[in-house]
Amino acid sequence: MKIIIRKGIKKDLSSVLNLIKELADYENALDQVTITLDDLEQDGFGIQPCYWFLVAEKDDEIIGLSFYWIRYSTWKGKFLFLEDFVIKEEYRRHGVGSKLFKETIKICKQLNLNGMIWQVLDWNSPAIDFYKKFDAEISKDWLNGRLTKLQIENINKLL
């Protein structure tokens, strides 16, 4: 199976959104995906892009996605934050994920980053096992905090 890994471009965004939704569905959170193609285009290809991505391609079909941005740690400096990493279900366990993940790791070297960080659901043992093949540390120490846009708007009304 010939797989091409390349930097994502604007015309890939429809396939990217489909993969984002496929991952969200797998994580039982499809109803939480509110991003649109217009949002992705503006945020990734506008004046100040805030994310980048790699795609895995087979016969001109996008079958994998590594979606990332640069995060800054006040303790350690710059890191690649891997927001989404997904391979279409029918292509999993064929080496596509490993190839895409290795190319993502290369970006860390190219950009002189101090590492790569991501989140994985504690019940997603196939993903955890995949990351452990790369000797990744899977932390159980940190809890994630979040405020939604609506919560922020409500708080701002009180200020």
What do the predicted segments below correspond to?
Residues I4-V16:
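A short beta-loop-alpha structural element at the N-terminal edge
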Residues G44-L54:
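A short helix-loop-beta-strand connector motif used in the catalytic cores of GNAT acetyltransferases and
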Residues V55, E61-W69:
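Conserved beta-strand in the GNAT
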Residues R93-K106, K133:
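Conserved acetyl-CoA-binding loop-helix of GNAT-fold acetyltransferases
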Residues K109-Q119:
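Conserved GNAT acetyl-CoA-binding A-motif
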Residues W118-A127, R146-K149:
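Conserved beta-strand-loop-alpha-helix junction that forms the acyl-donor binding cleft
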